[in-house]
Curated annotation (Swiss-Prot):
The gene is astE. Belongs to the AspA/AstE family. Succinylglutamate desuccinylase subfamily. This is Succinylglutamate desuccinylase. Pathway: Amino-acid degradation; L-arginine degradation via AST pathway; L-glutamate and succinate from L-arginine: step 5/5. GO terms for molecular function: hydrolase activity, acting on ester bonds; succinylglutamate desuccinylase activity; zinc ion binding. Binds 1 zinc ion per subunit. It comes from Pseudoalteromonas atlantica (strain T6c / ATCC BAA-1087). Transforms N(2)-succinylglutamate into succinate and glutamate. The active site is at E233. Its EC number is 3.5.1.96. The keyword Glycoprotein does not apply.
Amino acid sequence: MQTVNTHKLISHLQQQGQFLTLSRCSGELVQNPISFTLYEHTQVSIISPGIISFSPKIKSDKAIVLSSGIHGNETAPIEICDQYVIDILTGKIRVAHRILFIFGNLPAMDRATRFVDENLNRLFSHAHASESVDQNSYECARAKEIEEAVAEFYGSGHGEESRYHYDLHTAIRPSKNEKFAVYPFLHGEKHDKEQISFLLACGIDTFLLSGSPTTTFSYYSSRQFGAHAFTVELGKVQAFGQNDMSRFTQVNDTLKRFISGQPLNLKSFNDQDVLIYQVNQVINKHAEDFELDFSDDLPNFSDFPKGTLLAHETGNEYRAEFDGEAVVFPNANVAIGQRAILTVIPTTLD
């Protein structure tokens, strides 16, 4: 039974749509699950602060997860998804498929930092229970909460649904290829070319094929639930309100069409339209004196001749193994034991 305060909250959301603002500023109001019907055609379920789902009353064939803010300072995807939620709650968008929105690291958003204590995107597939992390941290509790929300969301559908998860990010540094996606390791399954075409329609033409299991959010959804899942990098980190949203027109429009069931008119896959890379080296930091041997502002996907020194630390030097080997996500400031650089080389899809 809903209280007077709950009715006021629901009315406020339908008028203003400000679920994310409410989650960040008055999280206690959405701490407990709340469900209501939107305009007699969509079931709304507030799971917890920053986690909300929408389900059309008409049966659909897709279950979609859109996540943003897994790193709190990656603002453009947060702003995109926030606007979707506002538009759905206020009736400007009508969803055609079940969709779960996750705004990941709320305290880090307030601090304008990637995380508070732990990198949330290294805590999935139960890594939050590892002895190597602070299990009392906000991020460990949040990773567990997010895993449970995703499991419940996918599990509450019917067996004929196709599952999708787009984990939206922006990168610390600029990139030679501004928008790119990481395709999680598939354990021998085929990469889906229709998904590549879909992301190409979003303005993403560069794909990095992961070569091993990881503890990222997209790998969790892919491995545990068979979802078409990607970590999608949409550009460079900017402060809230400082993003040039015209740079996100393609991804914004395509995702909006996808969740509202409008035709996508995807181009057939052609390997000439995309750049495909595979991971060659995963370079982890083993000592406090780990140091990159290139500029801190070097763009992602910058490449090097074979033998070039990429990084060093006590007892180790790390060099390019191939001509044209490129670096992605270099970050010397990670914790010991975590990935400091990915190196990638060009490849093709089977």
